[in-house]
């Protein structure tokens, strides 16, 4: 369960280490007063992170640090809390787009780009770990890895997973990409790439940006043609996985191979 975050004034998240002292005689409202050098308090997220480590911060406090200062009229901690509430978990943020972030009044293009960059780094790290742990004899692990890799793409992507004679991973690469609804895939190119990798078996996958994972008639036709073409060069097609954001469809599991 996510921990609630105390709502602090947005001014407390501003980096003003080089800010000069207030001019004599100038009265500044307390909620606009800037922090001076050395004015560190342990309840401030940035200082607490440096003093105690990142584990001491809640999810929304970590997001608030990424956002930096709040936009005028929008407390950065309230915005961070709204993101956590909307997506439910930090993993849910991996599926968010720039438009999703900018739908929040406290987030503009710069902050949105920062969040997208961080979530993409996190997503790629998860894919790397999933590839390292992937056991080809565990369909669930394979499908999870494929979903992490292409499930959130906003356009169609076709990838191939090359395996050796013991079903160990040789490589995974993108074969083609298309638009939101259409993509050109050439079986002979997949066969050529499989032979170049000296693969004994193959798993192919593509995503449906709509999120619906039910294969189309064209998906089924392509799978039959590809399976026949690979058999001519003694390469086994183990599966064709259709990937959505949160679900997958396996041709092998459905008995369509």
From Swiss-Prot:
It comes from the Bacteria. Gene3D superfamilies: 5' to 3' exonuclease, C-terminal subdomain, Cytidine Deaminase, domain 2. A motif (JAMM motif) lies at residues 206-219. Zn(2+) binds at residues 206, 208, 219. GO terms for biological process: proteolysis. CDD domains: MPN_DUF2466. GO terms for molecular function: metal ion binding; metallopeptidase activity. The keyword Cell membrane does not apply. Residues 37-51 have a biased composition (Basic and acidic residues). Keywords: Hydrolase, Metal-binding, Metalloprotease, Protease, Zinc. Pfam families: RadC (PF04002), UPF0758_N (PF20582). Residues 135-257 form the MPN domain. This is UPF0758 protein Bcen2424_2501.
